[in-house]
Amino acid sequence: MKTTNLPFNEQAVLFAGLLAAILGNGCVTPTVGSPDLFNGKDLDGWQVTDFAGGGKIEVKDGEIHIAMGELISGINLAHQNIPRTNYELSAEAIKLDGNDFFCGLTFPVGDTFASFIPGGWGGTVVGISSIDGMDAAENETATFKKFDNNRWYRFRVRVTPSKVQCWVDDEMAVDLLLEDRAIALRPGPIELSVPIGITAFQTVARIRNIRLQPIKP
């Protein structure tokens, strides 16, 4: 069988075309061959979310440093070139000070959005906001976990047409069936955190290794 060796740039174009054909319009990885949403150097592809009283945000040593704000602080993706379903979103975060959530993840669920809140409502509530008009402290996804300061945690969200699943490290925290459920963001400033956002509430946090990976249906 005869093989054809294409120049590197032609191979890259061919691979990108195949990937787009497989995933469909609007459902491509952030960069060809890489699931990374954060380059470790600057906020390229992101913007500081315009939260009133938000803390200072800067990139140092391969991490996003979020200073404590009056209420909520964070960043959101500055483009819409992301999957809406059949994907995994993950990030690692550490809380240095404060007593509330330090890596809220806002993400698309089909045509709407939701937020995974680890350590909200005083530091221990874990869950999804919002489901059928109820936030993470009120709906059936609410669980309770103590988050230690000065320790890195890995948070992961998986979205398919039928489910939203979330993990804290390797422990599943949410396993939500979507059929006949009304999914939406909690009304308020978190609505600025789309299409993908990372937030901290009155905490000092650092974020690294933000990744978005399409998964097979």
Feature locations, PLM:
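Bacterial N-terminal signal peptides that target proteins for export
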Residues: 2-15
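A subset of signal/propeptide-processing and intrinsically disordered low-complexity segments
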Residues: 4-6, 20, 145
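Bacterial N-terminal signal peptides
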Residues: 15-25
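Carbohydrate-interacting regions of secretory-pathway proteins
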Residues: 27-217
